Every structure is written in C-alpha cells, then in structure tokens.
C-alpha cells in the first residue's frame, strides 16, 4: 500500500519534473528567440531616437522663428503707435524771435502779431538771437530754435539810424525802416549795399553781393608778367615808373612833394599789346606787394571793366554802374592793397561830349568819370588805366594832366621788336624738324634764331611781294605802305600759330615731326593774303586813325597786293561814308 502511494508520488514527481523541464525548454527557446531578435530591436530603437532628435531640432528652430516674428510684430506695433501719435499731433508754427525778458518769457512775431510766450526747458533762452526763426507748439510756446531767414526782398541800404535799425530804399524809391538781425551784427554796411529783408517781420538778414557789379568787373590778378611781353621794353619802363614807383617808395614821393599819377592812357594801333601791358602791371604789382610786405603771396586787384556793358538804356544807370565800380575800388584799396581800374576800349563810352557821333549819352557819363577820378585824389593805391586805339575820340577833359597824367603810345613793332616778340612764341623746347636742326649743327637755339631771322626778314623786306597799299594824300603826294607798316604783336602770334598748325598737318601726312622755316614763310604769306581785303569799304580818314597813320589827310587808298604768281592787279578802295573792318 505504501509502495503504491510511493509510486504514485514518484510518478507525480516525475510528471512535475517533466513539466518543469518543458517549461524550462520553452523558456530556453524563448530566450534563444529573444536573443536572436535583440539586434533588430536595438537598431529600431536607435532609428526612433534619431527621428525624435530631428523632430526636437525642427521644433526648436520653429520656436525661435516664432519668437522673432512675435518680436518684429511687437516692434511694428510700437512704431505704428508712434506714427499714429505723431500724425495726431497738432501742426507746429514758426515765428521770429524779437527779444527776451527777465521772467524767462520771450517776444516773438508770428502770424502778423507780436506775442509774449514761454520757452520750453529744452531750449536755451540765452542762445536765441534777434531775428532768429523759432518753432512754436500748439500753445504758441517756443519748443525749438531754427536758423535765420534766407529768402525775402532785396532793398538798398541808405543810412544806419542807430545800433539795430537802418533806413533802406525799396521798390519805387519807397523808404522803410527795418531792424538789423544779429546775423548782420559784424557786417560793415555801406551806402548802396543790397540787403535781404523779410517784409512781414521787418528784419534785414544778409548783405547780398552786387551781381550787377560782379558782371562788369574781373578781380582776378592775371598771370601775365612783363617777361611774356616782347618789343615794348621802353613802354614797360614808362608804365612801371608811373605805377610801381609811387607804391614802392611813397616816402620819397612825399619828401619831394610829388603827387603820384592818377591814371595812365595806353593808346596805339590794335593788337600791339595795350591790354597785355595792363594785365602785366597787375601781376607785377602783386609781386612787389609780396616783397614790400614780406608775405609769401602778395595781393593786388585788377578791375577789368567791360566798357560797352556799362551802357544802359535807362537814364542814370550807366552813371550808377560807374559809381559802383569806383566804390568797389575804394573798398579794396582801403585795405592797403593796390587796385587797378582798367577801361579797355575807353573811346566806346567816354567819347568827346557834343561831338554828335553818338547818342550823346556821354554828356553825363564823362562828368561822372571825371568826378570819380578827382575823387581818387585823396585815396591811395587806386590807379586808372585806359586803353584805346582812337584816343582822338576820348573827351579832352579825361586826358588832361591831373586825371590820366601819363600817356604812353604803343607803337607798331619794328624789326628788332618783332624778333623779341617772335622769341616769346618760338622757343627751343618746341618740336623742330631734323633737317632744319642738321643745317645748324643740331643746335636748337641756333635753329630757332635762324627761324626768327628768316621770318623777320620776310615780314620787313620792302620787296614787291610785300607791297600792300598805295595812299594818296590831300596834297597829291603818294606813298607805298608795306606789310611791315601794319605789323603787330597779334599778327606775329597769328603767324606762329599758323606755322605750328602746318607742322602738325605735315606730321599727320608724312610722319615727319617738327617746325620748319618753310612753315613760317608760308604762314607769313597766308597772313598777308588774308589781310588783303580788310581795308575795303572804309573811310580813309577813319582807317588812318585806327591804323596809326597820322599826318597829312588821306583821300585815296589802293591795294597793291599781288597773287602768289604776281599776276593779280591792284584794286582801288572806294571812299564811302559807312565804316567797315579795320586792319
């Protein structure tokens, strides 16, 4: 019995053990399966982790963009709110500051009314200047300081009444009293000055330069010096004695009780250097000023008056312009600097009074100039220089001693003077033709001298080809005039320019560079040929005065110039009333 129970217990135990073995085998199999499947799971987890990290990065970037967008939107809202507030503000007005008071208030002129208002703490009351523009808020209080007015009407200053008031002349000779703004506090005012005023406030703000005078004068000192003028050494010495000596040695003139000359007249045929000398005088004076004052750069003023532009159809305007010109000269001379007032073509505006050869406007213009020149007597450093090729037409009262004291005739150049003038334009540094250089041993100086000598001989030779005019005098005498009798510095310069142009054209055609003697010879011929017709249809008397031929009255003129082959016959010149071109 016991053994059966033992067997049953043993069988049960075996079954139990078998079941445990089966479970263990299943567990081992499960573990084996799980062990086999574990690499695939780890890869999947890694992939899921990477995807999660990418999603996190995208969300972070999106979050940053949203934050920036929100900030930008917030800034735009703030700016729009400020813009709305600014547009909703009432308009600001402007006024003119008149003065301040001890209690901190100020007077302003606005809208045609004079008001006493307060000033914003942001504005320094002490910095406000009389006549200055200020900004006003809605309550008409000063909130900002502006600049001075820059537009208005132009009037003429007549008289200074006291420290801050002036009497001015407006349109139609209307007189008005205005206040002077602080912008004019340090500006010296002279009678005739143009002032800018604001008519509503009654303030004068600025002195306006006289444009009408600026158009008539040229203040720049020319760069022409005496070294650039040829053939006029005697005339240059005369004008230097007349102008430079009184300025450089005033004590010697005072010691000898010698009054410096007030003016100089340069007269002579056209193109002989009158204007050139006047320019050189101003340049030389500037250098002398530098030597006297010890300054590196001297200063002188050259008022070149454009004579015909002085004339005006309105009565009294020309005289007023002359007064303004001399007023300018006095202003410049008051600083101790020499001033030259140069009237070119003086006969065009200061003709003899009562001559009947013009509209007789000179009946008032000449006396105005005379009074101005006499007014220069008590004023130092002002010199009047006139230039004319018709000195016989200038009013004698201008030419008398005490006005234009020194009269210098600028003659036509003779052969020696022509060499000097040629040397100013033909220099060794010019391109010279190799053949011409070879003829003179390669010396550039010798070649240039030979060119000048050939040109002068060609111009001044009394040969058949150089005959120009035959003049008949009132007494029946006849005289043959050659081209040399009509030579001038301007003609010499023109001849040299023609020769240089020929040299350039030859270089472009042949490739050989350089100026040649034959270029100068051809230029002389072309210049003479070009002047053949210049004296036609000219009244002989007028022509003689212009050309510098004085003496017996000329009644008949005949041209003698011949063609290149010498076959062209001479022509007579008609004597008619109308004037034409002058040589």
From Swiss-Prot:
Xref: PROSITE patterns: AAA
GO cellular component: proteasome complex
Coiled-coil spans in chain: 2-90
Region annotation (Docks into pockets in the proteasome alpha-ring) ranges: 582-583
Pfam hit, one: Prot_ATP_ID_OB_C
Record has ATP-binding as a keyword: yes
Name of the protein this chain belongs to: Proteasome-associated ATPase
Chain's gene name: arc
GO annotation terms (biological process): modification-dependent protein catabolic process; proteasomal protein catabolic process
GO molecular function, one term: ATP hydrolysis activity
Keywords: ATP-binding, Chaperone, Coiled coil, Nucleotide-binding, Proteasome
Cell wall biogenesis/degradation as UniProt keyword: no
Written domain comment of the UniProt record: Consists of three main regions, an N-terminal coiled-coil domain that binds to protein Pup and functions as a docking station, an interdomain involved in ARC hexamerization, and a C-terminal ATPase domain of the AAA type.
Superkingdom of origin: Bacteria
Functional note: ATPase which is responsible for recognizing, binding, unfolding and translocation of pupylated proteins into the bacterial 20S proteasome core particle. May be essential for opening the gate of the 20S proteasome via an interaction with its C-terminus, thereby allowing substrate entry and access to the site of proteolysis. Thus, the C-termini of the proteasomal ATPase may function like a 'key in a lock' to induce gate opening and therefore regulate proteolysis.
Subunit structure: Homohexamer. Assembles into a hexameric ring structure that caps the 20S proteasome core. Strongly interacts with the prokaryotic ubiquitin-like protein Pup through a hydrophobic interface; the interacting region of ARC lies in its N-terminal coiled-coil domain. There is one Pup binding site per ARC hexamer ring. Upon ATP-binding, the C-terminus of ARC interacts with the alpha-rings of the proteasome core, possibly by binding to the intersubunit pockets.
Pathway linked to the protein: Protein degradation; proteasomal Pup-dependent pathway
Binding residues annotated for ATP, in chain numbering: 271-276
PANTHER family per the UniProt record, alphabetical: AAA-FAMILY ATPASE, PROTEASOME-ASSOCIATED ATPASE
